[in-house]
Amino acid sequence: MFLTRTEYDRGVNTFSPEGRLFQVEYAIEAIKLGSTAIGVKTKEGVVLAVEKRITSPLLEPSSVEKIMEIDDHIGCAMSGLIADARTLVEHARVETQNHRFSYGEPMTVESTTQALCDLALRFGEGEEESMSRPFGVSLLIAGHDENGPSLYYTDPSGTFWQCNAKAIGSGSEGADSSLQEQFNKDLSLQEAETIAVSILKQVMEEKVTPNNVDIAKVAPAYHLYTPQEVEAVIARL
């Protein structure tokens, strides 16, 4: 007896006859509703810029975290469900610290991304396994290791790709096409900041201010920009 479409919809571990996992596809669709995040890699390092949606004037802008530090040399920007992102980031932090403790060296950016995606593919661990749904979040992971700067993009299927520049979230289609036009491998870090924020400005529905944009760089150490530093980047546009 064949299951109906709705039964394939509910089962996260069941392939449909066409070979599709609908829950994973829906999670990928959910990210298209999230705030826009942009990553740009240069020879000096990687820049991340993210739109922060401040839904109320009563909200404290600094409490909306869209860029997080994983280790001294790795940071990540997110789009989608922040709680899911936090679960993945906490897992990555533990992995990087365990690696540092065991081997006396920092974990490579690719290995950290792989550890994150392994968890994404298992849909949680320990007691969370009973929840068993895909993580509704996509990440841009920026880092700097012995191989130089790198930028990775992950999605809810547990797949990851290495990119030179990438946009995720609701404005990703327009932002990606702008990145293709403006990106070149000889960009300086300062030019990458300007490009990332100017593209965010195009896709955002409101004026760009230090309250609704976060910027970070990994060059080679992770650094989240202060509101004054963000203001200086915006002033260059």
Curated annotation (Swiss-Prot):
Listed GO CC annotations: cytoplasm; cytosol; cytosolic ribosome; nucleus; plant-type vacuole; proteasome complex; proteasome core complex, alpha-subunit complex
Swiss-Prot/TrEMBL keywords: Acetylation, Cytoplasm, Isopeptide bond, Nucleus, Proteasome, Ubl conjugation
Molecular function as annotated in GO: RNA nuclease activity; structural constituent of ribosome
UniProt-listed PROSITE patterns: PROTEASOME_ALPHA_1, PROTEASOME_ALPHA_2
Family matches, as SMART domains: Proteasome_A_N
Subcellular location: Cytoplasm; Nucleus
Modified residues (N-acetylmethionine): M1
Keyword Acetylation included in the entry's annotation: yes
Any GO BP: proteasome-mediated ubiquitin-dependent protein catabolic process
Matches recorded under InterPro entries: Ntn_hydrolases_N, Proteasome_alpha, Proteasome_alpha-type, Proteasome_alpha_type_5, Proteasome_asu_N, Proteasome_sua/b
Lineage top rank: taxon: Eukaryota
One matching Pfam family: Proteasome_A_N
Cross-link Glycyl lysine isopeptide (Lys-Gly) (interchain with G-Cter in ubiquitin), where in sequence: K43, K66
UniProt keyword annotation of Lipid metabolism present: no
Family under the similarity heading: Belongs to the peptidase T1A family.
Its biological purpose: The proteasome is a multicatalytic proteinase complex which is characterized by its ability to cleave peptides with Arg, Phe, Tyr, Leu, and Glu adjacent to the leaving group at neutral or slightly basic pH. The proteasome has an ATP-dependent proteolytic activity.
Subunit structure: Component of the 20S core complex of the 26S proteasome. The 26S proteasome is composed of a core protease (CP), known as the 20S proteasome, capped at one or both ends by the 19S regulatory particle (RP/PA700). The 20S proteasome core is composed of 28 subunits that are arranged in four stacked rings, resulting in a barrel-shaped structure. The two end rings are each formed by seven alpha subunits, and the two central rings are each formed by seven beta subunits. The catalytic chamber with the active sites is on the inside of the barrel.
Protein name as annotated: Proteasome subunit alpha type-5-A
Organism: Arabidopsis thaliana (Mouse-ear cress)
